[in-house]
Amino acid sequence: QQLLEDIARTKSALDRAYSNFENVIDPDLIDSSIYELQSIQMRYRFLLRQASLLEESS
């Protein structure tokens, strides 16, 4: 249950990060948005792998 909540929260954060990236103009903020997106994407992939492993072991 906790894992599913983490996945949902991370997906929401990823959606917000994409929205922020599309709206920034300043080059420094663009770089910052890219790093944020990459970080959240890595966490999202990690959580999805964990869910997959948990499902396989059930």
Task: List each model region and its residues.
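Charge-rich amphipathic alpha-helical interaction elements
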Residues: 1-58
